[in-house]
Amino acid sequence: MSIKSDKWIRRMAEQQGMIAPFAPELVRHNGTGKIVSYGTSSYGYDVRCANEFKIFTNINSTIVDPKDFDARNFVDFVGDVCIIPPNSFALARTVEYFRIPRNVLTVCLGKSTYARCGIIVNVTPLEPEWEGHVTLEFSNTTPLPAKIYANEGIAQMLFFEADEVCETSYKDRGGKYLGQTGVTLPKI
């Protein structure tokens, strides 16, 4: 299994629709100033966070249960900046929609710019033949409020091509998050 380069990522995005919308180069400015970078890097693709957020709240005194998740655990927020409370958690989604080829495993990692501020993005795989917007999970590990910027870089995707095609893909087994759009809550 080998990691794929910027040339491969560009080709797959432009010819196969693997990433849409797609930035063929790393973007560091938005016309008004510096931003957290997004787009194609040497061996990965830095994704942007959309402006839809779900922020954890305890106002309803519910219990967090992955088998029986209560949507009242979150407050919905739309905006260019999301403030995550101290020692709390938020969900968002990528701007980009992904279509992962059958012979590729993609891994989502956090960007060091955010990690150095105590904001951690969950490491998660995008399995062969999965497609959709990626739901992103952010933990604010600090005792202070923390900012997440919409439409700027938030995480990096690494693409690994397998030596052989998998026998059963995410699509084949009817994966529960296949084709997700928007911020998707846990499912069983």
Swiss-Prot record:
**Reaction catalysed by this enzyme:** dCTP + H2O + H(+) = dUTP + NH4(+)
Which biological process terms from the Gene Ontology are attached to this UniProt entry?
A: dUMP biosynthetic process; dUTP biosynthetic process; nucleobase-containing small molecule interconversion
**Residue positions of the active site:** 137
What top-tier enzyme class does this entry carry?
hydrolase
Q: Which Pfam families match?
A: DCD
Q: What GO MF annotations does this protein's record show?
A: dCTP deaminase activity; nucleotide binding
* Coiled-coil annotated residue ranges, if any: none
Report residues binding dCTP.
111-116, 135-137, 156, 170, 180
Keyword terms: Hydrolase, Nucleotide metabolism, Nucleotide-binding
Which PANTHER family does this one have?
DCTP DEAMINASE
| Xref: NCBIfam families | dCTP_deam
Which family is it part of? Answer: Belongs to the dCTP deaminase family.
The name under which this protein is listed is dCTP deaminase
Ranked from the top, the taxonomy reads: Bacteria, Pseudomonadati, Pseudomonadota, Betaproteobacteria, Rhodocyclales
Gene giving rise to this polypeptide: dcd
